[in-house]
Amino acid sequence: MSKISKKKYISELKVLRVELVKLQEWIKQEGLKVAVLFEGRDAAGKGGVIKRITEPLNPRVCRVVALSTPTEREKSQWYFQRYVSHLPCAGEIVLFDRSWYNRSGVEKVMGFCSAEEHDEFLRSCPIFEQMLIRSGIILIKYWFSVSDEEQERRFEARLQDPTKQWKLSPMDLESRAKWIEYSPVSYTHLTLPTNREV
């Protein structure tokens, strides 16, 4: 795949932004509820894509949810509970910068959940997502990946750029060494039953 020129990129971006604004207006007018999950490897471009999507949109209609590490209280709750209050209302788009799939990604690979908790997630997630779909939520899921070499290059660039260092946490640096362990995660994300139905 070849890169497009900057001029062509800007031209295409303008066209797509107009379409996004039209889509937003249609969602608002029809009272639709749209939840978009952005998952993937660190430095794969999730944040950049979310930024490009939200820039032309009305923040009263489209919002981003990027939850921090769960509190002790949240850890004691039903796993999906912390996400439920952020789900979209009629006429709203919610973009999740990471989601409940943290359980099968970061939490599993980094040892933040037990094997039993992970297995329960794999059983419960399709049921939870079916509940969302039956309630009228349009659920869209994206998985972003990047090669081991490209991830290393992007991490290095972030370390060198003071304006981007906030994007790297000690956990990101630790997880960098587990690139191979994250590989099966994308398969899990893409093959849970609701993914074929969404």
Please provide the spans of the model-predicted regions.
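Charged, amphipathic alpha-helical linker segments immediately N-terminal to NTP-binding catalytic cores
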Residues: 1-12
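Pre-Walker A adenine-sensing motif
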Residues: 21-27
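Glycine-rich phosphate-binding P-loop
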Residues: 38-53
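Short beta-strand-centered segment that lines the nucleotide-binding/catalytic pocket of NTP-utilizing
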Residues: 60-70
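Conserved nucleotide-binding/hydrolysis micro-motifs of P-loop NTPases
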Residues: 70-73, 99-102, 145-152
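Conserved nucleotide-sensing/catalytic segment adjacent to the nucleotide-binding pocket
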Residues: 74-117
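A glycine- and Lys/Arg-enriched "phosphate-lid" helix/loop adjacent to the NTP-binding pocket
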Residues: 108-122, 132-183
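Conserved small/polar residues in nucleotide/adenosyl-binding loops
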Residues: 188-194
